[in-house]
A protein has these predicted regions:
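Flexible, solvent-exposed loop/hinge segments and secondary-structure transition points
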Residues: 2-17, 21, 25-26, 33-34, ...
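Extracytoplasmic/periplasmic C-terminal soluble domains
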Residues: 156-205
Length: 205
């Protein structure tokens, strides 16, 4: 009986010796990967990219958040540059495209209707309406326009704001982003940043 008790005690000690390193390894990995790695990565990103890590937020003169440079939103009134149409109503919680194929007659009819509306609003020929002003982006939240799509809105915005067209064209040019690393994508205008510049210009007058 005594020998059996000693054997059982030794077996329990061996089990404990086997489990203890596994538990310590699991706890250490959890601490390292779940806490220290995340905290270190977050701190590094905030130090290196303070604006982007907070969502590229746009603020007014009082510091109030008015939007994000990454997410398009509608602007009411003719004194603003308008972004692309959105199947999601510019709602980040419902980001999506229309899922209509190019062969869908409903898509062709919608684009034709939008083209006529933009042409009348901007006082240009339908053939001069840039495609991105009448087509939706894949996620419905794209804040960018082609330079041509921004330029066709200059006359309207300048008239409403009492600015000269050359002055406004210079503002558009200043907010035109080049190709990514000079290779990827196309030149584009961030409508959110451009409209923020309009607010700052109006405040400075």
């Amino acid at each position: 009986a005594a020998a059996r008790t000693v054997a059982e005690r030794e077996a329990r000690l061996q089990q404990t010796a086997q489990w203890r390193p596994a538990i310590m390894l699991g706890a250490g990995t959890l601490l390292l990967a779940g806490a220290l790695y995340a905290a270190g990565g977050t701190t590094l990103v905030r130090l290196a990219f303070p604006d982007q890590s907070d969502g590229s937020l746009l603020r007014d003169a009082n510091g109030a958040v008015r939007g994000s440079a990454l997410v398009a939103q509608p602007f009411a009134g003719d004194g603003w540059f308008q972004s692309r149409p959105s199947a999601a109503g510019h709602d980040p919680m419902a980001a999506a495209g229309s899922n209509m194929a190019r062969s869908n007659p409903a898509l062709a009819a919608r684009v034709a209707e939008a083209t006529a509306a933009v042409a009348a609003h901007e006082e240009i020929a339908p053939a001069d309406v840039p495609a991105d002003l009448v087509t939706q982006s894949g996620g419905g939240l794209d804040p960018h326009l082609s330079p041509a799509a921004a330029q066709v809105q200059v006359r309207r915005v300048a008239r409403v704001r009492g600015m000269s067209e050359p002055e406004l064209l210079a503002l558009v040019k200043a907010h035109t982003e080049a190709r990514q690393w000079g290779v990827f994508g196309q030149p584009r205008v961030n409508v959110m940043r451009l409209n923020q510049a309009l607010m700052e210009h109006a405040r400075a007058q």
